[in-house]
């Protein structure tokens, strides 16, 4: 199958999801946009040495049966998408990708292969199909979200924590584990709270200098840190939301960005930058490329078409 | 109340639970055995400067109404214990302290104030009383068990882990968090598994170079790593049981000691050293002394007698 | 003596050189600009509680006999400076402070007390006087320049180094030591080169993925990494100049800034951000305030006038 | 040439200097003692799969033209050595290997190829020949001496350093750099002193909680820490001599061992364990094997005979 890889144009995105060294025994033809490897100083020649075709962005879209885009396809590329094309990547069909599904996927009968960690499925003509992609394939990406987000937040806040800095981490999933690993380089004065021990956090939350959130709560769940609780935090407390669950777990919080990563409200500081794995894109690209090559690019991607075949006659 | 502090004689125990700098406004008289601070280079004079009485071991036992012993009182001291004396410390009444309870506590009507993290209670004449001591008072000690145990195990095994070393941590409680924090100094190639994700561990456990256990399972629970599963681990895999739950979570494993910390079985290596917080006694003593001074030694300890008063008429 | 402390207006400067908790037994009157502690969430009230006078910027300049300014006084404040006033801080009289000396210090007969690490002297009417300030008083600031600069550079470059990343550090002084300490959190694949071993670096420099410079060479010294040597570095090599010795040690390199910290040239990346200690201002302020309180603010600063008294009749 | 590799019998030595994965295109025949890879769980079969001959210890000595022994050949093996045999390894001809040179090398006309970092030479019949081995080939071993020695010393002393722990490192060579990298995982409150700044150390040495020595001074040099200076150190100060320069740099200090690593003298603690790289033998073996394969085992070792040929007619 012809798979097209285009340069990321998602704001702040610098990860390169396929590296020449991992291109081995691919049962797919790979079309790569000129300068695809630029962020990692990889020349086009290195991709063509591995049998890839180097084309312009438009040509890649035009000649590919499937487009791999790590992040959501941006509106500026909508006009490239052709009827029946396959899209592989994080598409967040029930989240930030809803408008893409409505405006592009449905009308153009796109075959959307979503790499969501918990339910990697195929979305086609309002139906959901099992994809055969292992669950948690890219779990480490969430780990990196916590890992890189904490480091960036600390530097932007201007503090290297020490054993004197009291640190709470909410959640014990991959994002929280990445945050825990990252901040452990500097301090072991950390306590990780999860469902069973959250009551202890509620009794002690005002003691913390840094509170790191790694939890995405459900729409109807109560926030873990309400407005009033935030008010009783110490002056100067730093809240790092590496789950980027803006406004939910930390009531009233809003997104920040890589260029303006921290805002202050009533003497507390909030870091709610999304897409933080891209901060350490040189590490993450290595891992992504290895996993995607083994699980997506190596085997013929027409296998995903067969999954939706009956509808796709 | 007269509280006696004697030098630790529990094998390998070097923590000093009370430091002169924390002795302020104590509503108790403190009797300290000569050389009590020796492990931390604290002279007897520094204790007497703070109003403590420096006595021989026998005199401390003889003149104290309550004996503080961080670890279980050892048989060699049984003969010192007098009728109705109070014992404060970790006494493990349902675990390793059962024989102490049977042979000493009951017959001598001792008032046993147990500092157990989850249920800090008073045991007196076969009855259990609420102690008023906050739960999780010494939670950080479990954290240190994981923290120090992992570091010691790595050095004994001869490996500083890198990003190439695949590491699994079982559990997300304090012991597991200490282990996670400790090994994060060297690698972020870590995944922490807990109840909800243990099935993923079961599918992947053979990939790991190091498996760290931070879980104490119940008597009737299945082991998390059975004999057969251990057989299919990679040659040279290191299993660090910082919960020191010998024979349970890791089927068939047995205790090791600080002097002989690792044994090999079928090409796998096992570290099951108990009491690992004592490895970094210089850090832990600081924390213990502060917490115990605030929560145990400052207020009059006769408060514990009042808790059991009706029976103690 | 009346000492005035005004908010930093040096680009990117966020350190607060005096904290209320360190104000004890000062033989000087302290005048503080409103909002002086803002970066560290310290209210004006906390300074007035310690006997400081809270004034507007203009009033501080107007009423102070000495102005403490950590960084060079900026042109926008020149008009505030009065004849015979004392300036205490880093004034770089032979470096970036030359124009200040010429335009302000000399004509207004300012008494300039320079806190330079190697030669902390007083400059007054073209004469240089010994200050009595201990050498190396603020050596740790250079350490932090290396420490924070490396961390920021890595995040901007998008890489957390591992044991696979080959790292060279040039120099063994305080800046180089800070860089060494910082990057050691992530990798031990480091070699520090100094005068005696620089020849070994010259034989091996093309093997390195990251080259960190902690050396300020003399005006007439050869660069340590010439244009041609830079050309033969690996594609993607990151050069972090935490000595910010732009154009000297690394031939042809130029300053970058906190907002645009890295530039690429022929596939190599250059980070040459000056004033990096300010990146971790929350840590550095604590240390600065303690040292400055003990060595500058506590004793009567008129002692510096006496040093230049004969001329100042 | 036939090269024999025997199991280490140097006290505490666990490094395995050749791993099967590095055996490629060797121009030498390799004879390996049974169980040679045991410490790293490498079976004899893995060596024979790579063309090695698996023999008893005696057979290896009997059939090899050259014996590779990382550490000094022990007296228990002297009787194996045959006239004219080659010995490759660290032989310390002017240090601990003097008796070996006198009792074995000279009388049996052994060709001793010493892997000393600064002067890798061949010693044959009282003559010294250039070996062609690059200088600093195994420099990283000294780095590991500092790295592992510091970690072991801290654990034996019972302290994980924090930012409150004042740490001095003497020297800026490879051993000192390893120590610096190791302790930087836990604290950045470190200052490295070398020739130019040693005077500053002499003015401040009593402030330090931990003093790490990475310097081997010359026989006639004054100690860096004299008896009297040691007396004025703080009670409980830990002195870690990872240069293991017992009795010289730290006046009066004596060797300790892995089993009894620390002694106390007048309230100060001394760690002077030699051969500390072997503590982390699993890391160091990987590095040693790669470097030795490339620089020693790959090319025909008879090249060393040719270096001494005229004498060896």
UniProtKB/Swiss-Prot annotation, chains A, B, C, D:
The keyword Oxidoreductase applies. It catalyses: N(5)-[1(S)-1-carboxyethyl]-L-ornithine + NADP(+) + H2O = L-ornithine + pyruvate + NADPH + H(+). One of its GO terms (cellular component) is plasma membrane. Keywords: NADP, Oxidoreductase. SMART domains: AlaDh_PNT_C, AlaDh_PNT_N. Is potently inhibited by the reaction product N(5)-(L-1-carboxyethyl)-L-ornithine. Pyruvate binds at residues 15, 71, 92. Homotetramer. Belongs to the AlaDH/PNT family. CEOS subfamily. This is N(5)-(carboxyethyl)ornithine synthase. It comes from Lactococcus lactis subsp. lactis. The lineage of its organism: Bacteria, Bacillati, Bacillota, Bacilli, Lactobacillales.
